[in-house]
UniProtKB/Swiss-Prot annotation:
Its cofactor is [4Fe-4S] cluster. InterPro entries: ThiC, ThiC-associated_dom, ThiC/Bza_core_dom, ThiC/BzaA/B. Coiled coil: none annotated. It is an enzyme of class 4 (lyase). Keywords: 4Fe-4S, Iron, Iron-sulfur, Lyase, Metal-binding, S-adenosyl-L-methionine, Thiamine biosynthesis, Zinc. This is Phosphomethylpyrimidine synthase. PANTHER family: PHOSPHOMETHYLPYRIMIDINE SYNTHASE, CHLOROPLASTIC, THIAMINE BIOSYNTHESIS PROTEIN THIC. The gene is thiC. Binds 1 [4Fe-4S] cluster per subunit. The cluster is coordinated with 3 cysteines and an exchangeable S-adenosyl-L-methionine. One of its GO terms (biological process) is thiamine diphosphate biosynthetic process.
Length: 626
């Protein structure tokens, strides 16, 4: 530890990022209660102004939106990152009666860190003793689902996915929604707890929720549900602190990150992860091989199964919800990458490839896969089977190495399912648009509809600094085709470690991609927010336009650059067209004119009817005697 690190006592000094705890404008946190009082599902309610009288003068119902920000945006909750978030799930876990509290950490490395006095000032101060399944028990959501049990977590996500859809319909918020094309997905008109159970039992969806992460607000990942996004955080050997990483977490979930992966490779990985998990209302994923490599000083050849196993237990006892495991990088696939333009670009993939070549043995993650499953089901950690041979350039897309590994991931998925362990599959990468659907179709075929989770894909390689856009295009497409979760890409991709601004930009970009995919799939209720914003735009309700958007701050700032006065917030134009050329203002004038013409036409028509009736009453004679 440096002198500066020794001087910092995080258990005394750590503070929440103040930007992350500000409520959104005109929004309030609401909770929808389930069948028991401790099932309280958070949503964000956006209140709207009334329609102006010259547009018909009506009341606009508030709009509910999916909320990943946890208690951070609830003004009634006091946030103290030194203590962590409130417990959401322990009562549910206790009621199932299949877990036990350990006397302490059981991993060797975890005990070593706990006993290191020098780390006391960096350590999260309120560490609980971990839980583990009782001997012979399986505590995975898939295991419960296959036994016909609807857990509290399943009910929770059903409420969360529905977003009070019936009430929205009754309020007239869904008068219009285009039919979608779901490419064979089975999206119901309403998400029920029983449907959630069926999808998890089938392996088509997962609820990543480690029994040691009771703070998590359950969410679901699957092709028949809302498309989710993941945001990556984590330190490197070159920088960032624990406090900065917690700030990135809270900032990311504010803008809509459904899960967060901690990809730390620098100092104090164990301590950083503890702070992140204790303060996270969303599932946390990791790549355990990164930390295992740090334990052998970065020498891949020195990795051994026993050390990796201890790392899995260490992280499972902290509460990691899903592990990226690169078990599909087999020895026979490595030579297939030799002629690639960019070779092996996955960090985990390159580590395992190097180990395989150095020992000329099969990947130990593959040979010990059943043992990994035993660990996963003891804590309900989900697999995210890593695509270690994903293409790192569009030139390498859909090659033999990539698809060979995908076939192996399908084989491993079926092994995980035999253990009732939840599983999703990671995907590319860099893929031109015309090859994206082939990726999705092959994944569905090889992995039997297990959820797909892709990094983009990036559709072109020519735009360093703008890869959030090159990948957002591919993300929207593959989300439409059936991908369940999209891993965000920031503007710093390939260039450097992202900061807070980069995190926000990446998340907003991917929220757009995910929502566009939901619309295209025809997810029930997906168009509610679009309809509300379009109506506000036509009625020149500027504040409602800002507040209904994914990023109210930026929308308001852009508007105010040229029209900063409050009077401009009720003006019937913006600076793009000005008062005389606003298409929506002109359209309204045309409507008013048409209404007047229609009124004249009605008067004329009534007069003609009266004359016709008089003609008939007078005998229908063309001429009358004078």
């Amino acid at each position: 530890m440096t002198k500066q690190e020794k001087a910092i006592n995080l258990s005394e000094s750590a503070q929440v990022d103040q930007q992350s705890v500000q409520p959104f404008p005109r929004s309030r946190k609401v909770y929808v209660e389930g069948s028991r009082p401790d099932i309280r599902v958070p949503m964000r309610e956006i209140s709207l102004d009334d329609t102006p009288t010259d547009f018909g003068g009506e009341t606009n119902a508030p709009v509910l939106v999916y909320d990943t920000s946890g208690p951070y945006t609830d003004p009634n909750v006091i946030i103290d990152v030194r203590k962590g978030l409130a417990d959401v799930r322990s009562a549910w876990i206790d009621a199932r009666g299949d877990t036990e509290r350990l006397d302490g950490l059981s991993s060797d490395f975890g005990q070593q860190r706990l006993n290191d006095a020098e780390l006391a000032k960096l350590r999260f101060a309120h560490v609980r003793n971990p839980r583990r399944a009782k001997a012979g028990a399986n505590v995975s959501q898939m295991h419960y689902a296959r036994r016909g049990i609807i857990t509290a977590e399943m009910e929770y996500v059903a409420i969360r996915e529905n977003m009070k859809l019936q009430e929205a319909r009754a309020a007239g918020l869904l008068k219009e929604q285009h039919a979608g094309h779901s490419f064979g997905a089975n999206i119901p008109k309403e998400i029920t707890p029983e449907f959630v159970r069926q999808e998890i039992a089938r392996g088509r969806a997962i609820i990543p929720a480690n029994i040691n992460h009771p703070e998590v607000e359950p969410m679901i990942i699957g092709r028949n549900f809302l498309v989710k996004i993941n945001g990556n955080i984590g330190n490197s050997a070159l920088g960032s602190s624990i406090e900065e990483e917690v700030a990135k977490l809270t900032w990311g979930i504010r803008w809509g990150s459904d899960t967060v992966m901690d990809l730390s490779t620098g100092k104090h990985i164990h301590e950083t992860r503890e702070w992140i998990i204790r303060n996270s209302p969303v599932p946390i994923g990791t790549v355990p091989i990164y930390q295992a490599l740090e334990k052998v000083n970065g020498v891949a050849e020195d990795l051994i199964w026993e050390l990796f196993r201890d790392t899995l237990i260490e992280q499972a006892e902290q509460g990691v919800d899903y592990f990226t495991i690169h078990a599909g990088v087999l020895l026979r696939y490595v030579p297939l990458t030799a002629k690639r333009v960019t070779g092996i670009v996955s960090r985990g993939g390159s580590i395992m490839a190097k180990w395989c070549l150095a020992h000329h043995k099969e990947n130990f993650l593959y040979t010990h896969f059943d043992e990994i499953c035993e660990i996963m089901k003891a804590y309900d950690v989900s697999f995210s089977l890593g695509d270690g041979l994903r293409p790192g350039s569009i030139a390498d897309a859909n090659d033999a190495a990539q698809f060979g590994e995908l076939e192996t991931l399908g084989e491993l998925t079926k092994i995980a399912w035999k253990h009732d362990v939840q599983c999703m599959i990671e995907g590319p990468g860099h893929v031109p648009m015309q090859l994206i659907k082939e990726n999705m179709d092959k994944q569905l075929e090889c992995c039997d509809e297990a959820p797909f989770y892709t990094l983009g894909p990036l559709t072109t390689d020519i735009a360093p600094g703008y890869d959030h856009i090159t990948s957002g295009i591919g993300a929207a497409m593959i989300g439409w085709f059936g991908c369940a979760m999209l891993c965000y890409v920031t503007p710093k991709e390939h260039l450097g470690l992202p900061n807070k601004d980069d995190v926000k930009t990446g998340i907003i970009t991917y929220k757009i991609a995910a929502h566009a995919a939901d619309l295209a799939k025809g997810h029930p209720g997906a168009q509610i927010r679009d309809n509300a914003l379009s109506k506000a735009r036509f009625e020149f309700r500027w504040e409602d336009q800002f507040n209904l958007g994914l990023d109210p701050d930026t929308a308001r700032a852009f508007h105010d650059e040229t029209l900063p006065k409050e009077s401009a917030k009720v003006a019937h134009f913006c600076s793009m067209c000005g008062p005389k050329f606003c298409s929506m203002k002109i359209t309204q004038e045309v409507r008013e004119y048409a209404a007047k013409i229609e009124a004249v036409d009605v008067t004329v028509e009534e007069g003609m009817r009266e004359q016709a009736e008089r003609f008939r009453q007078e005998g229908s004679q063309l001429y009358h005697k004078v």
